[in-house]
UniProtKB/Swiss-Prot annotation:
Principal location: mitochondrion
Family annotation (InterPro entries): Mitochondrial_sb/sol_carrier (IPR018108), Mt_carrier_dom_sf (IPR023395)
Keywords: Ion transport, Iron, Iron transport, Membrane, Mitochondrion, Mitochondrion inner membrane, Repeat, Transmembrane, Transmembrane helix, Transport
Transmembrane segments: 17-36, 77-96, 112-132, 170-189, 204-223, 277-296
Subcellular locations according to the entry: Mitochondrion inner membrane
Source organism of the structure: Caenorhabditis briggsae
Coiled-coil residue spans: none
Family: Belongs to the mitochondrial carrier (TC 2.A.29) family.
Name of protein: Mitoferrin
Entry GO terms, CC: mitochondrial inner membrane; mitochondrial membrane
Presence of keyword Repeat: yes
Membrane topology annotation: Multi-pass membrane protein
Glycosyltransferase recorded as keyword: no
């Protein structure tokens, strides 16, 4: 029985779309929600209107937010990202598995590294189209002095004041960041899987380690574009006044694209501005991607085993 389960787990990429959808949706929710407080810290550090208190580390920043604003504040926007990440990751993992199977002939090995990267790029195009609106709402909820009572109110206000285009203003930047991120991420994961788990059986330890290493490297390399994306998503806060939150809502955006945001970041912070939030981003991504791959592979294994057992 155990051998049959492993065999079906190995053959999953060729035929089991429902399993990939279910496992991917759950993995997405875990990835984005478990380490969400550090994502909130990263957003504030990268915004051009960070909180007044300068903190030496992301952990100190998180403690400062909790002390000044309450322990629930770092979780603002988590429901938006959960709602967006489940369908986005369901499609993301499914497209990746199908593209990988198509490009490699369902075989594994270091010679397929570019195929893994290409599969990740295609999956990212689909993922970001679904995820970008949730990302906009999430980051505006994360900002200090954010006036929105809920993610739904935030989405409604953004739509009424700025139109539907506001939800995709950072889409090209998101792709410019996530295409290399996911290419590095997937190539790194498959590389470490080949090193740690050459038989490609279900092995929780190898999935955890490979996911964490791949996610950490990809996060560090793509931090500059993440800074640009955050500025585009949160630019309303550029004119926020703690004593009058209505100014936040009435502020008009100033950066119409990547080039405007890049120039503004450089003029205000220099080259160091493109590495803001690097530590917080890596702290978020290493456990997040490790857990995401672990949950995905676990549920893929469990669902395939259940299917084999019932038949």
């Amino acid at each position: 029985m155990g051998g049959g389960g492993e065999d079906e787990y190995e053959s999953l990429p060729t035929h089991s779309i429902p399993v990939h959808l279910a496992a991917g949706a759950l993995a997405g929710a875990v990835e984005h929600c478990v380490m969400f407080p550090f994502d909130s810290v990263k957003t504030r550090m990268q915004s051009l209107c960070p909180c007044e208190t300068k903190c030496p580390t992301p952990v100190h920043s998180l403690m400062s937010i909790v002390k000044r604003e309450g322990w629930l504040r770092p979780l603002r926007g988590v429901n938006a990202v959960a709602a967006g990440s489940m369908p986005a990751h369901a499609l993301y993992f499914t497209v990746y598995e199908k593209m990988k199977s198509f490009l490699t002939g369902n075989t594994a090995g270091h010679e397929h590294t570019l195929a893994y990267g290409a599969s990740g790029v295609v999956a990212t195009l689909i993922h970001d189209a679904v995820m970008n609106p949730a990302e906009v709402v999430k980051q505006r909820m994360q900002m200090a002095y954010s006036p929105y009572g809920s993610s739904l109110e935030c989405a409604r206000c953004v739509y009424n004041r700025e139109g539907f285009a506001a939800f995709y203003r950072s889409y090209t930047t998101q792709l410019a960041m996530n295409v290399p991120f996911q290419a590095i991420h997937f190539m790194g994961y498959e590389f470490w899987q080949q090193v740690l788990n050459p038989e490609h059986k279900y092995d929780p330890k190898s999935h955890l380690i490979a996911g964490g290493l791949a996610g950490g490297l990809a996060a560090a390399v793509t931090t500059p574009m993440d800074c640009v994306k955050t500025v585009l998503n949160t630019q309303q806060a550029a004119e926020a006044d703690p004593s009058n939150r209505r100014i936040f809502l009435k502020a008009r955006y100033r950066y119409r694209g990547i080039s405007d945001a890049v120039r503004t970041i450089y003029s205000q912070r220099g080259m160091a501005g493109f590495s803001c939030g690097l530590q917080a981003r890596v702290i978020f991504q290493v456990p997040a991607t490790a857990l995401s791959w672990s949950v995905y592979e676990l549920f893929k294994f469990m669902l395939s085993f259940e299917g084999g057992h019932s038949s």
